[in-house]
Amino acid sequence: SCSLVGSEMCIRDRLRTLDVRLDKHQDNAKKVAAFLSKYKNIKLLYPYKKNSQNFKMWKKYYSGSSGLMGLKIKSKNKKSVTKFVNSLKLFGYGYSWGGFESLALHQSNLEIGKRNYLKLEKDEHLVRLHIGLEDPKDIINDIKQALKHLK
């Protein structure tokens, strides 16, 4: 963590490794996305994937991706989706972009609100993932064990 006294040096040091960290987020997220795209009850919201509704726009304007993705999980049992998120061992709970750790968040319909671009179908639940810098095999294994809770 950075103190106010050394914040300039801290920011400078963190900026030096930003490109390396973002590349790792991207690489890890691509592996996780490939794993998750095998599940029929999960619709992956990640523009890097060719079957994403935003792939063409992403390809036109961007040269890389991030560690952020959304999962639209089809389940009649909301508690099982919450249990899925809560059983993730490597993931913290919360929002992030670019931090070192993987995070997960089960978004409620109230938080989504009236966003036209993010409509959930009946029995769909949104889980937001930030894929961190941990070993991608460990991240995938953690998600795999947590998926057993979905009903």
Question: What does each model-found stretch correspond to?
Answer:
Residues 13-20, 67-75, 127-132:
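Short, well-ordered beta-strand elements within core beta-sheets of diverse protein domains
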Residues 44-107:
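Conserved PLP-binding catalytic core of the aspartate aminotransferase-like
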Residues 75-76, 87, 102-151:
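PLP-dependent enzyme catalytic core of the Aspartate aminotransferase-like
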